[in-house]
Amino acid sequence: MIFSILEHILTHISFSVVSIVLTIYFLTLLVNLDEIIGFFDSLDKGIIITFFGITGLLFTRWIYSGHFPLSNLYESLIFLSWAFSIIHMVSYFNKKQQNHLNAITAPSAIFIQGFATSGLLNKMPQSAILVPALQSQWLMMHVSLMILGYGALLCGSLLSIALLVITFRKVGPTFWKKNIKKNFLLNELFSFDVLYYINERNSILLQQNITFSFSKNYYRYQLIQQLDYWSFRIISLGFIFLTVGILSGAVWANETWGSYWNWDPKETWAFITWTIFAIYLHIKTNRNVRGINSAIVASIGFLLIWICYFGVILLGIGLHSYGSFTSN
């Protein structure tokens, strides 16, 4: 009873804090709060409080259930929300690169945790005895690595999607013109020609407009570079987690079912997801095709992760259907 009350308290604390952080962060898009010293640092600390709240929630559930809390959909979603908090903390303590990961990690954490605690999963929060197939020391290693991999890959893919949105918005309708580079050069030459033939007063105004336009484009360029920087590194980390998770799952499957690979629906989609992100990493090694192309591949991977994560759960089929919507 005490553990159940403590779990509810920690759930409400973590959910409330991340909700407040998300609300305030998006308010900063409408109101300029840059002058408030330490404001954004306080938002980051809010995510850290959420991290400790979810950590306490997982440990509490681990203690009174007697097993690692990754046996059903509710627990895996809470763990996934915890993974997003970790990603945010890693970027927070890395002061060398400015980033905007809280715009990705905070909404992801609140939506995932909100879905986990919603009425759709009202039967899931009750911890139950593990089925025989899950009573193994491989449960902690395999499932935790897979969900950490999902979290990192989802975060990196969302950054790639943001990169695509900013890039296409920057280019605009002229993106598909073949002579876009020529038009750009002509516009630049024309702008500087005008500077020589207008009076001094108008010249100053025009120079200010050009400076403002250049600063705006330079900021977008920096933002795109930051998104690409963090997307590549987070996806690389997630790919490592996913690879080790699949390998540990193969060893566990051999001990449980007598075969390393059974082409179960979950295994098949995990392999497809792994292949897509392997292609992404391969594209990043080629300077001629990386950039938008790699971001498009990561966007496809974003959809595949959700198919891999929820596909078996929604259908309730295969060897990985434990804790699904249809299973009891």
UniProtKB/Swiss-Prot annotation:
User: Which NCBIfam families does the UniProt record give?
Assistant: cytochr_II_ccsB (TIGR03144)
Q: Which GO CC terms are listed, alphabetically? A: chloroplast thylakoid membrane; plasma membrane
| GO biological process: one example | cytochrome complex assembly
**Protein family:** Belongs to the CcmF/CycK/Ccl1/NrfE/CcsA family.
Task: Name the domain of life.
Answer: Eukaryota
Its chief place of residence is plastid
Per UniProt, subcellular location reads as: Plastid, Chloroplast thylakoid membrane
| Pfam family name, one | Cytochrom_C_asm
* Gene transcribed to yield this protein: ccsA
- Which InterPro entries has this protein been placed in? Cyt_c_assembly, Cyt_c_biogenesis_CcsA, Cyt_c_biogenesis_CcsA/CcmC
Keywords in alphabetical order, please. Answer: Chloroplast, Cytochrome c-type biogenesis, Membrane, Plastid, Thylakoid, Transmembrane, Transmembrane helix
How does this chain sit within the bilayer? Multi-pass membrane protein
Q: What does this protein do?
A: Required during biogenesis of c-type cytochromes (cytochrome c6 and cytochrome f) at the step of heme attachment.
Query: Which residues pair up as cystines?
Result: none
Q: How does it assemble?
A: May interact with Ccs1.
Q: Which residues cross the membrane?
A: 13-33, 46-66, 73-93, 101-121, 146-166, 234-254, 263-283, 295-315
GO MF annotation: an example: heme binding
Q: What is this protein called?
A: Cytochrome c biogenesis protein CcsA
